[in-house]
Amino acid sequence: MLNSRSVGSTGSNNTPLGRRRFDEKPDSLPPLPDANGMSNGYRDSYKSNSRMDHRPDGYHDGRGRRAYRKHYWGHPTPIEEMLPSQMELETAVKSCMTMEQLELYSLNVRLEEITQKLRTGDVVPHHRERSPSPPPQYDNHGRRLNTREIRYKKKLEDERHRIIERAMKMVPGFRAPSDYRRPAKTQEKVYVPVKDYPEINFIGLLIGPRGHTLKDMEAKSGAKIAIRGKGSVKEGKGRSDPSVRGNMEEDLHCLVTADSEDKINHAIKLIDNVIQTAASVPEGQNDLKRNQLRQLATLNGTLRDDENQVCQNCGNVGHRRFDCPERINHTMNIVCRHCGSIGHIARDCPVRDQQPPMADSTADREYQSLMQELGGGSAISNGNGEPQKSIEFSESGAASPQAGHPPPWAAASTSVSSSTSSPAPWAKPASSAAPSNPAPWQQPAAPQSAPALSMNPSSLPPWQQPTQQSAVQPSNLVPSQNAPFIPGTSAPLPPTTFAPPGVPLPPIPGAPGMPNLNMSQPPMVPPGMALPPGMPAPFPGYPAVPAMPGIPGATAPPGAPGSYNTSESSNLNAPPGVSMPNGYSNR
């Protein structure tokens, strides 16, 4: 007895599900009539199609679904949708062929099918079992960019381009269809698994420090790689660019563009290698990540080369102590508080009962030498002529005489009891008495006082003594002129010190090297020069210099008759106890 629920005017299925699912035999119940009293012969009336009524039994199943003919090269094509030209294509292989010939034949058949679809415009499949359409996209003019016809046509064109590229590699003389236009550039998208690994920074690994990793991949593959999609651009940037704004709705991906398929495949391989390494290897062991950090430090100038660093724990090169893979050496971390050495404690110190040597004795010896040199003493010996020894530790290793006493720097005011060693320079008491043999830079400067001028002409140097000459009459003086300086005579006076005849010279206060004396007028005419005609001789005791015949005003040369030698008449002898200057001798 049928349930009352199964009988109705809606034409719903009244067959139990368990019976349809597990019973292999066809249902023996007759088909129920529809609301109009007609029966379509199928239980699933809502899936029925009028075209299925006239189809042979071999082209539909018991559920009313359409059957398709399977092809080798791609998506199935319904038989009723195939054109006559497509039905004539020979797909059966009737002769023996090699693998290369079979592959080339299949490529040729698929290429003819795609070309026929593109020529007729029949690119959209008619069956309803197709993928759902993506959200619509529009350009700046409001035209839709991803309609069904555009998407399927682009898909067929990309497939035909790949087939032709592959056929051209296999057959050098292969000819493409006449309507084929090779695209200038080929694009491919490689999606990044950001949703599966949200904690990994794929963008940073792909771009690298200042874009060097991305540039290296582009240089190796010859293709251009661009990162597009969500997360590729910071918020607020790129909104004005329509190309960037259109890609922001897609998932994060790498857009690879090149002019050949090989370059694109090489770039895709490099991108997949980076993604797989980041997803499978921990961050601390990722060589790509470490190389990028090292390269970034090199670009910033903060690189510290650890390859030449010596480990303080194991002594190997290439790592530091905190990264040492070997066991930690606790002995090297123990420092003795008594002697300052490493490797033992103060209880086991070998010099615990002795005065430990200073760690920096060389610096102390240099400092002592410097202080002794500044103090005027010797840096290599003490007062008794013995070599200077260290005051902190003796060479024999025994305790020094001062063992148990405070260190020298703590008892600066105490005197040293040992007579064989002098105290340190910093321990010497400050003495008010001046040293017996001070250093040149410690000697007091001489007082600056004006030299006392003696009024006795005999105490002056020879070159400052006045020449002995006879009394000069006021009538014998000539107008003042600059007298030249002659060696062996007195120094000339300034031009302003000459007085008119009969007027004594005033004293010259503060003249350097000149006494304050009222000296007589020096000769106005140098030796060897004749006075003008009519001028009396300034030195009556000496004969006048005869003039040379024929030349008025010229004197006779030395040695001529009537001439005299001035060098013989001058007294250049130095006073007793005074040596002559260089270049002069006593006559």
Swiss-Prot record:
Disulphide connectivity of cysteines: none
Start-end of Polar residues biased regions: 1-16, 379-399, 465-483, 563-573
Localization: Cytoplasm; Nucleus
An annotated GO cellular component: commitment complex
Residue span, KH domain: 191-271
UniProt keywords, alphabetically: Cytoplasm, Metal-binding, mRNA processing, mRNA splicing, Nucleus, Phosphoprotein, Repeat, RNA-binding, Spliceosome, Zinc, Zinc-finger
Listed GO MF terms: mRNA binding; RNA binding; zinc ion binding
Region Disordered: start-end pairs: 1-64, 121-142, 375-490, 551-587
Residue ranges with Low complexity bias: 410-454
Record's subunit section: U2AF large subunit (u2af59), U2AF small subunit (u2af23) and bpb1 interact to form a complex required for complex A formation.
Protein name as it appears in the record: Branchpoint-bridging protein
Protein function: Necessary for the splicing of pre-mRNA. The BPB1(SF1)-u2af59-u2af23 complex has a role in the recognition of the branch site (5'-UACUAAC-3'), the pyrimidine tract and the 3'-splice site at the 3'-end of introns.
Protein's GO biological process: mRNA branch site recognition; mRNA cis splicing, via spliceosome; regulation of mRNA splicing, via spliceosome
Gene field: bpb1
Keyword Cell membrane: no
Matching Pfam families: KH-I_KHDC4-BBP, SF1-HH, zf-CCHC
CDD domains cross-referenced by the UniProt entry: KH-I_BBP (cd02395)
PROSITE patterns assigned to the protein according to its UniProt record, in alphabetical order: KH_TYPE_1, ZF_CCHC
Phosphoserine sites (modified residues): 131, 133
Species assigned in the record: Schizosaccharomyces pombe (strain 972 / ATCC 24843) (Fission yeast)
Biased composition (Basic and acidic residues): 44-64
